[in-house]
């Protein structure tokens, strides 16, 4: 079973994203900060990450930079999920492969992106 780490400080959104992960046959775990994410990555070794770009008290960009600085994590698939006005092309240098807009995201869109991410991690 594929493993998805969800870094999301809004419990409602974390629960929604966990449901989408389950729908594509993935096991999901959630954390609320970049520090917790790095600890979970070390201990659990997820196959992919979904990251809210606007974490309370810290920036997701700091986590993205941290991930890129580790050779064993640099290729970890990352999906950004946010209400923020962000452009996927601006995030690609940080290793982000997909972007989900919380304001307009449909369940089928999220499931399709999760499936695509996991198909690329075979």
PLM segments and residue spans:
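Acidic, metal-coordinating helix/loop segments flanking the phosphotransfer/catalytic sites
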Residues: 30-48, 109
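Two-component/phosphorelay signaling modules centered on CheY-like receiver
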Residues: 11-29
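Alpha4 helix (beta4-alpha4-beta5 surface) of REC/receiver domains from two-component response regulators
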Residues: 61-62, 83-116
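Acidic catalytic/metal-coordinating carboxylates
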Residues: 33, 59-62
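Short amphipathic alpha-helix used as the core "switch/output" element in two-component signaling
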Residues: 61-74
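The feature encodes the CheY-like receiver
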Residues: 56
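Active-site residues of response regulator receiver
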Residues: 52
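Conserved acidic carboxylate
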Residues: 8, 82
């Amino acid at each position: 079973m594929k493993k998805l780490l969800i870094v999301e400080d809004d419990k409602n959104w974390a629960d929604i994203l966990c449901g989408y992960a389950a729908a594509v046959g993935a096991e999901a775990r959630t954390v609320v900060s970049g520090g917790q994410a790095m600890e979970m990555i070390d201990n659990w070794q997820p196959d992919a990450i979904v990251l809210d770009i606007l974490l309370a008290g810290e920036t997701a960009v700091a986590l993205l930079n941290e991930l890129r600085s580790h050779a064993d994590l640099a290729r970890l698939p990352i999906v950004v999920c946010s209400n923020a006005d962000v452009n996927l092309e601006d995030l690609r240098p940080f290793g982000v492969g997909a972007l989900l807009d919380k304001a307009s995201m449909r369940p089928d869109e999220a499931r399709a992106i999760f499936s695509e991410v996991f198909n690329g991690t075979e």
